[in-house]
């Protein structure tokens, strides 16, 4: 990872090749993507590890096994403690992308990963409440208002799909509670202070990120 992140001065982070602890021929995470539905998802999850053998650019490094450049991390303002437990890696990677830095995947760095080792299960109140809260905060923090407006139909659809999913799982109220808390975080004085201010200097990066989020939705998520 150290060698990979040192290859270019604009590489902010490098994500390891995370294979399943239960089956080391299967990918658990090969870098993270983010799409216009407001969903973060693991690249390659559940697929054969042999198919992920080349370095490439990713939306953000998975914080479960990654390296970050300290100088850039200090420039960005470190990890946001308000993003506790979920999506903090997407947040810091997104902030880096806005400034023109890159996040990479390095297949030579292999980690055996036990998914949901911290929260204890794939679906539980702790995870659903925090991840839904943070998903709203992530958008409010990193998207300028016009980008939120443009993506609103996609975001509404994404949140509605997840809400219906969690209703069926018996966690609808928990998911809705998390969304409300995320909105309150965005509207709080602390949330407003942490919001990334739009700058025309970074307009090309915003356009590139928007295109990537749409591509991740329609090509990598819906029709993959």
Question: What residues fall within each predicted segment?
Answer:
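Non-catalytic, C-terminal membrane-associated alpha-helical segments of glycosyltransferases
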Residues: 148-224
């Amino acid at each position: 990872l150290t060698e990979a992140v040192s290859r270019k001065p604009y590489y902010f982070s490098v994500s390891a090749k995370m294979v399943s602890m239960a089956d080391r021929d299967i990918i658990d995470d090969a870098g993270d993507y983010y799409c216009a539905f407001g969903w973060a998802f693991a690249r390659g999850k559940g697929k054969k590890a042999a198919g992920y053998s080349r370095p490439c650019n990713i939306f953000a490094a998975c914080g479960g096994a990654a390296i970050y450049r300290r100088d850039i991390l200090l420039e960005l303002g470190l990890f946001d403690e308000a993003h506790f437990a979920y999506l903090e890696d997407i947040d810091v990677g997104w902030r880096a992308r806005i400034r023109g830095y890159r996040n990479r995947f390095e297949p030579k760095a292999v980690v055996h990963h036990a998914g949901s080792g911290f929260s204890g299960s794939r679906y539980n109140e702790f995870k659903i409440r925090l991840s839904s809260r943070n998903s709203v905060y992530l958008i409010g923090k990193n998207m300028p208002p016009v980008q939120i407006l443009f993506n609103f139909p996609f975001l509404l659809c994404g949140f509605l799909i997840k809400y219906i999913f969690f209703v069926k799982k018996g966690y609808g109220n928990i998911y809705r509670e998390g969304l409300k808390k995320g909105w309150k975080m965005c509207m709080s004085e602390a949330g407003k202070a942490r919001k990334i201010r739009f700058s025309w200097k970074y307009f090309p990066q915003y356009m590139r990120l928007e295109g990537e989020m749409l591509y991740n939705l329609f090509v990598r998520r819906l029709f993959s």
